[in-house]
Amino acid sequence: MQLEIINPESTLVNDVVAHRVAFSIGSNFNIYWYGIIFVCGFLIAILTYSLRLKFHYKVPYDPGFYYIFLAIPMTIIGARLWSLAIGDAKDFFDFRSGGLAIQGGVIAGVLSAAVYFPLILRMPKYHIRDIDADGNVVIRQPSMWIYADAIIPTILIGQALGRWGNFINGEIFGAESTVNDLQWLKKAMPAVFEGMKHYFIEGNKTLFTIYQPLFLYESFFNVIVFVFIYFGLSYIKQLKIGFISMSYFFFYGVTRFSTESARAPQFSFEGTYIINSLLLIFGVLGALYVQFIAPLLRKKFLLDAIIEMFYKKKDQIHKFGELRKPEEFLFYCHK
């Protein structure tokens, strides 16, 4: 939902908030600030997780790069469908009128990744050499969870930047407040302070209601959470792969619960608490699975027997022949 009345007297807010159009190509094609911020969020996230894959996890980053060409359309489609479902958009193809819900984008992006990465990581050129506990050189297929840990938390970068696009569009407002309570905002960010005012006409007077800058709180919290789970959790050696990516869903649910309860009633959507609850539960169950259950399953003889029945390791090793050096053992496993 957007505010339609912008301060008619403040040139500051008109320059920053009311001008949703960054520039125009020709006379009819406008490029909006929201779109520019959206693209910048994507690019920064891509750069971040590519560096993470290359220098931290030391696995090929090409699969993550190629995933972009699947993730972008799937994310946009998912976000658009979700906006239609919650009533924030009326026409699927009218992208220029807004309506991209992050929940739908996240779900669509994760589902497409769950199909894409297991397939592409089977390709021998993406397998890596490593040293096992006995000092033997082995060839390993990187786990899909490594890419999940590198990529999924960077969604927070896009969310943090995207909230500023919401600000320019006149979206994401908190509860009603007072000028006195927001003096800190007036001093620190005058344009944001003015942008939180909703002007209306009552009789012969021009009045305004001022709202809490909820977009700013959520943007700041997203940055804090990103730094914590992306860098802080990496120093806890006891955590299994996949825990970091599952932490995103947990903290996302917590963040949305906190911010949705602080929204002004006219800017809330029905059903938001349900999907936030599901994402939070998914994060908790997923973290428990990758930390405790998955390691146990990998040690079970029965599971190994089932894998052997449906997946012929000898055939796979035969395909790896060109990768092996004379002194190397060839072994298929997950890192």
Swiss-Prot record:
Residues bound to a 1,2-diacyl-sn-glycero-3-phospho-(1'-sn-glycerol): 163
Transmembrane segments: 31-51, 67-87, 100-120, 213-233, 235-255, 277-297
GO molecular function: phosphatidylglycerol-prolipoprotein diacylglyceryl transferase activity
Keyword Transmembrane assigned: yes
Organism listed in the record: Ureaplasma parvum serovar 3 (strain ATCC 700970)
This protein's name: Phosphatidylglycerol--prolipoprotein diacylglyceryl transferase
PANTHER family, per the entry: PHOSPHATIDYLGLYCEROL--PROLIPOPROTEIN DIACYLGLYCERYL TRANSFERASE, PROLIPOPROTEIN DIACYLGLYCERYL TRANSFERASE
Membrane topology: Multi-pass membrane protein
Biological process according to GO: lipoprotein biosynthetic process
Enzyme class: transferase
The protein's role, per its UniProt record: Catalyzes the transfer of the diacylglyceryl group from phosphatidylglycerol to the sulfhydryl group of the N-terminal cysteine of a prolipoprotein, the first step in the formation of mature lipoproteins.
Compartments where located: Cell membrane
Location (main, coarse): membrane
Keyword set, alphabetical order: Cell membrane, Membrane, Transferase, Transmembrane, Transmembrane helix
Pathway terms, separated by semicolons: Protein modification; lipoprotein biosynthesis (diacylglyceryl transfer)
EC number(s) recorded for this UniProt protein: 2.5.1.145
